[in-house]
Every structure is written in C-alpha cells, then in structure tokens.
C-alpha cells in the first residue's frame, strides 16, 4: 500500500505541473487509462488471499477516485485560465456604433396596393378575391365580351384549352361577387393578371385592381367624385384630372382618366365607366332598379408614376439596389 500512496503523490505532482488541458489528459491516461499505473494495481489483487481482496480493492478505488477529483479540479482551473486569457486578449471599443440591423421592406407594388386598399376601405369598400385560372364565361362572356367580339383579341390571352385561361383582368371577381350577393355591393378586387406581352411598359404578369359599386341611384357624378378624391389622395397633390370618352365592352358610358404630369403632359392612369346593363342582366341584377360604376387600374403603372420609375421590368428583377430605395 506504500507503493499506492507513492503513485497518488506522483499523480498529484504531475497534475499540478500540467500547463494545459492536453497535458492534463496525458496525466489521466498515464494513471487512470486502460494500462495506467493505478488501473494495473487492480491486477495485484489476485495475489492476495481471498479474504483480503475486498479491503485492498476498496483502497485502490479510493486512490483512483482521489486522483480523478484532482484531475477534475485542475481541468476547471486550466479552462478558466484559458477563458480569462482569451478575454484579456480581446479588445472591444465600446464607443463604436453597434451593427446595423438589416430590416426588410415592402415591395413598392405592395406599398401601392396597401395604400389603395386603405383609401377605399375608409369609403366602405371590401376586398374581394377570385381564382387566377379562370373560365371564359367569367373573364369574357359575362362581361359583355362574347366569343365573336373583337375585344377578345386585344387581351393577348394565355389559354389552357378552349374554355380555361389565365385571367386577363380581375373583372371576373366582380362577376362572381354580383352572382353571390345582391346590391348594395361595394368592392375592390386586387390581384395578379396575365397577358402575353413583354417590353419596357408591359410584362406577362402584372397586378391590377378593379373597383365596383352597384346600388340604386348611382351616377357618373359619383364615379367622378370617387376617382377625383382617390387620385389626389394617392399622389398627395391637387392634381389636374380629366376624363376622356373611351370604350369598354362592360361599361357604358366609358372613360379613361388622365392626370397632368410634371412635364406638362397628360398621363393615362385608369379606365372606368358605368356598369353596362347587359353585365347586370348576366348576373341576375335588374338594370331598371340598380346601376353601378366600375374602374380598373394597373398597380405597376401607378407605382411607376408615383415613384418616377421608368422601366416596368425593374419591379420583377429582384435587384436589391432598386428595392432598397423603397424601404
């Protein structure tokens, strides 16, 4: 047992001399490893009489436990010293500004949609939605555009088959709403629409918003007043606005609305008109009792005018240098 005490003393000395965790682990292997000095002491038990083996084994285990505790304590000291050394080596200038958090931002077209929804929401309009894969009845026929009508050719439609298509306008939402509920109706219908066209001012997919009111005694004066208020609110200017006679199959009379630009030229911003009696009849609403007005506008077009963007395609190219300007 005197030899055992000597081993413990030697282990303690080696532990205290270990300068880092790696050196300490070498001491652990030397004394407590599979072939370590203290581990091999267990093999001497077979040379003892059976009645002495339990007591001798307990002494060896106590010695191993003593060394293990010394190893744990020294390891904690070394790890703490290493941490303190790293912290001391680090220099932090607390006068430097913190790292800026990169906040996200809304896409400019989304900003436009939200702004318009907010304005019309205050006038009592609700937001209505519908499918982007539409049938020709809701996209054309019910809107007074039968199969032989030349206006169908103007839409550059993406067809799936003879009756299914990617909607070219959100007017189908108006048809579905009027079929589902009786007047009074007051909705706006924002959403993606699709036309086979691509250049500086057109993309195959773009965003449109249409508005619809159907009630008794709705007149063109109501339409003009609503759109005057909207355009001046949207552009935040006392704009000069004009209504030009135009033609749309689903409204009569129809008009296109222009605003005076900063360059002294008129800029087209939207189309509108009184809901055609045929459209009301197609959805089961009596045009002798009810009347209404509708309007439609391109979200990208309005966004370009509001922010001075010259190329429509910029909205879809995901260029962060462009998008960050609207944060």
From Swiss-Prot:
Cofactor(s) listed in the protein's UniProt record: Mg(2+)
InterPro entries (alphabetical): aa-tRNA-synth_II, aa-tRNA-synth_II/BPL/LPL, Phe-tRNA-synth_IIc_asu, Phe-tRNA_ligase_II_N, Phe_tRNA_ligase_alpha1_bac, Phenylalanyl-tRNA_Synthase, tRNA-bd_arm
EC number(s) recorded for this UniProt protein: 6.1.1.20
Subunit composition and interactions: Tetramer of two alpha and two beta subunits.
Free-text comment on the cofactor: Binds 2 magnesium ions per tetramer.
Stored CDD domains: PheRS_alpha_core
Annotated positions binding Mg(2+): 252
Metal-binding keyword on record: yes
Gene encoding the protein: pheS
Compartment(s): Cytoplasm
Name by which UniProt lists this protein: Phenylalanine--tRNA ligase alpha subunit
Keyword Metal-binding among record annotations: yes
Top-level class of the enzyme under EC nomenclature: ligase
């Amino acid at each position: 047992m005197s030899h055992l005490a000597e081993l413990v003393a030697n282990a303690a000395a080696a532990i205290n001399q270990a300068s880092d965790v790696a050196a300490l682990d070498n001491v652990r292997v030397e004394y407590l490893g599979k072939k370590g000095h203290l581990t091999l002491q267990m093999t001497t038990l077979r040379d003892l009489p059976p009645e002495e083996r339990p007591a001798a084994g307990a002494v060896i285990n106590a010695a191993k436990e003593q060394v293990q505790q010394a190893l744990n304590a020294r390891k904690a000291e070394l790890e703490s010293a290493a941490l303190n050394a790293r912290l001391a080596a680090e220099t932090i200038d607390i006068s430097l500004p913190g790292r800026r958090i990169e906040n996200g931002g809304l896409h400019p077209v989304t900003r436009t949609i939200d702004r318009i929804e907010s304005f019309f929401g205050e006038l009592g309009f609700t937001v209505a939605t519908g499918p982007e894969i539409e049938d020709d009845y809701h996209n054309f026929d019910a809107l007074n555009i039968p199969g032989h009508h030349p206006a169908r050719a103007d839409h550059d439609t993406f067809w799936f088959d003879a009756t299914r298509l990617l909607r070219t306008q959100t007017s189908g939402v108006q048809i579905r709403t009027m079929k589902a509920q009786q007047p009074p109706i007051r909705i706006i219908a924002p959403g993606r629409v699709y036309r086979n066209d691509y250049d500086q001012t057109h993309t195959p997919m773009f965003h449109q918003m249409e508005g619809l009111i159907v009630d008794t005694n709705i007149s063109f004066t109501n339409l003009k007043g609503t759109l005057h208020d909207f355009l001046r609110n949207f552009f935040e200017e006392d704009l000069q606005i004009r209504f030009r006679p135009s033609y749309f199959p689903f409204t009569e009379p129809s008009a296109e609305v222009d605003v005076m630009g900063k360059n002294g030229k008129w800029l087209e911003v939207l189309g509108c008109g009184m809901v055609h009696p045929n459209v009301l009849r197609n959805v089961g609403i009596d045009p002798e009792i009810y009347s209404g007005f509708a309007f439609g506008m391109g979200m990208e077009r309005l966004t370009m005018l509001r922010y001075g963007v010259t190329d429509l395609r910029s909205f879809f190219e995901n260029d962060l240098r462009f998008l960050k300007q609207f944060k």
